[in-house]
Structure formats: structure tokens, C-alpha cells
Amino acid sequence: MKKIFTPFALLPLSLVGLLGNNIAVAQTEQVKTTKQTLNLPAPNLDASKNRFSKVIGWPEGKTPVAPAGFTVTKFAGNIKSPRNIYVLPNGDVLAVLSNSERSTKEQIANVISGKAKSEQGGESANAIILYRDSNKDGKPDLQSLFLSGLNQPYGILVIGNTLYVANTDGVVTYPYKTGATKITGKGKKIAALPAGGYNNHWTRNLIANEDNSKIYISVGSGSNVGENGMENEVKRANILEINPDGSGEIIFAAGLRNPVGMAWAPGTKKLWTAVNERDKLGDDLVPDYVTSVKKGGFYGWPYAYFGQHEDPRMAGKRPDLVKATLVPDIAVGSHTASLGLAFYNGKKFPAKYQGGMFIGQHGSWNRSELSGYKVAFVPFKNGEQAGPMEDFLTGFIADLEKAEVYGRPVGVAEMKDGSLLVADDVSNTIWRVAAK
């Protein structure tokens, strides 16, 4: 797919330089707040091991497991690869259906390596399904094809009478009316983005600020660690900022290898994102993380990781950027593929969870033992982390020794009734977690 870039003239001067020339520990120790010391192992280029999970699907009647006091039910099924979930202002639920599209050569290689068994394959559905629960019983009584003919969509946003959809190659707007079950108007592309990306870095997410005056777009890298040349990473590994009409594009934050989930911490103006860090430095490097994002901030990729730890593959190339690298807020485990992100704003969950953060961890492949494959929770109070990360929704791993999994969680979203929805792309399911 053709890559379209905007001129450097659109970028703030503080970041033009960043992009023109383009930072032994157990997994359980990688969930501390980084206000504490995080002891990382030395990078080892020879220690990297691949272990792809094998998806076997959920047996009839079996569900993921939530803590005591919660119920888990199937909200929707038999839909191909639900990756993201967006709850409309009127309570309708949009499920974004999309998956990686592989060339014939890639498909053959993935069969040989075992990767094909761990992901949703074939042609992407490239569609959005609408669900409506009219009688509020936790089960949708209406399902409608809301929008189709998209290009690997992921992010959705509604501002007034405008629907925004982030395809892999750009942001498109459509006329929208509250209560509509199908989009019939023609789309208008308002922002071009570089398409595709390394591994599964084709997702583009969207979020607006409180007064809807700015929109933020997450864009992942085109490589693991810049191995294809930084000239191929323009507008990548960033969170971009635009006006609602697509104008005024700037790079809001850079050096974020693959930022996917984005959310505002309740009661604050802090934008948080979930970031997938780099591969092939060993089982316990580099920790994925969630972090609040500072305007103009640089978070290391590809030169440094988790603060000013220089990547040996980029040694000596940009010591200035290594020095400028910010330390992320919360480590969430290496290779966990932490993608989904949502803060809980409701009152139906116990007080412990109110205001807290939920993280959809899609699960590892570049690690000798599986990590992730769960929804994690981080308690927050007054918009700040108030305790260590803990498991919330588990049971996705069927057999750790055989690396068999029932499913893989991705997007997370809170419904208007205070329940939590979890997209499980490889099992074609959306789960609903509700307090008893």
C-alpha cells in the first residue's frame, strides 16, 4: 500500500530534529510503578526465543475468569476478529472487525513458524458492527452492519454529528445521526497516515480531548527497531494531534514504538497510552508499558528503552535522544502485547476498581514462556496510580506447557450500564464482565 506523508513544515520545530535524523528480572517484577527502581536485565541479542501460542477456541459453556463478585457472559459471537470496541453516546456498541492481512509469502512463512495458529488469518472483514441492548439485560437485541468497505479500521470517534474512523492509511469522516444503525453517507478522508507496519502495527487509534477541539491519533512503527532506515519511519511511532477538520497536524509525542490504547485519566487532563515495546533482546526485555504522555515528549524508540537504556542495535547513533528519553509511568511485563486501555468511570464495580485502569494484554510470541493473555487492572486514585498491577480477567491460557490458548483479549471498553466489554479477536467473541 502506498505511504503518504505530510511535509515536515507541519511538525513542531522541537520535533523536526528528532525525526529528520532519526531508549535477571521476573515478569512479576515488571509491574511496579517506575517511581520505584526497576531492575532490568542486560540486553542479550542471542537470547531471544519465539514461542507462538496455538488458538484452540473456547469450549461450549467456558468463559474467561473474573474475580469473585463478577459474572462473565458472551455479549457477541460469530463475528470475525473484533479488535476494538467503541460505545456511542446513546449507549450503542460498535465492534471494529479487522485483522492483519498477509501476502502469500508471509502466510507460508507463518505456517512454517507456527505463527499462523496464533492469529486471525485470511482477508480482513474491514467492517463495523453495531449492537443495541434495548431492554438493558446485558444482551444485544439488535445487530446491524454499521459500516463496511474500510481499510483495516481500528479507532472510532464521534464528535457531534460526525463519525471518525481510523483506517490503517488515514482518518475518514462520515455524517452521523444519534441512533443511526447504519452509515449511509459518503466518507471524506481528512488525514493521511502511513499504512501497515511491523508485525501488527497497522492499527490507528483515535481519541479527542475534553472540549473536542483536538483529536489524537496513535501510529505504530514500521519496523522492530529502525532496521529499515529511519527515512521509512516518518510519522510513525508517534501520537499525532490534529484539528477536527484534519488541519493543524503536529507530532504530539514521539518515540512510542507501537502506541495503541489511549484514554484520559478521570478527573485529569492527562492522556495515557498503552505501548508495545521492542523484540529480540531476551525474554524479559523490553517491558511493555502504559504511560501518561507529555506534549513534545520523546519516549526512546528506537534509540533507547524504558528511560535512558540504550538499545545495543542503535549504539552511538543518537546519544542526544537517549539523553532526552522520558521514563514511562508503569511497566506491564515484557512482550505482553498490551493493546487495549480503558479507565473505569462508572459506579457499578466495587470501589477498588472505580477510576482504575484496565489493560487488554493480547499475549506474547517473542518469549520462551507465554506472558499476557489476560486483562490486567491498575488501581488509580485522583488520577494517579495507587497500587501495583493485578490480574482481572484470566483463563485465556488453556495449557501453558503446550502454549494453547482459548482466546486473546484486545480492546476494552466500559458500557453505559457500568459493565466492561472485552474484544477477543481470535475467538470471534466479545465478553461482558458485570458486577453481581
Cite the ranges covered by each PLM segment.
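Beta-propeller domain segments
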Residues: 28-67, 104-105, 203, 221-227, ...
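Beta-rich, blade/repeat-based domains predominating
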Residues: 79-90, 148-162, 196-214, 254-270, ...
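Short loop/turn segments immediately following the C-termini of beta-strands
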Residues: 90, 98-100, 168-170, 176, ...
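Residue position within the beta-strands of beta-propeller blades
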Residues: 94-96, 165-166, 216-218, 272-275, ...
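A short loop-to-beta-strand structural motif that recurs across blades of beta-propeller domains
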Residues: 116, 126-129, 170-172, 238-240, ...
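A detector of repeated loop/turn-to-beta-strand junctions in beta-rich toroidal repeat architectures
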Residues: 124-127, 140, 168, 184, ...
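Asp-box/WD-like beta-propeller blade repeats and closely related beta-sheet repeat scaffolds
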Residues: 139-162, 167-209
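Blade-level signature of beta-propeller repeat domains, shared across WD40, Kelch, NHL, RCC1
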Residues: 413-436
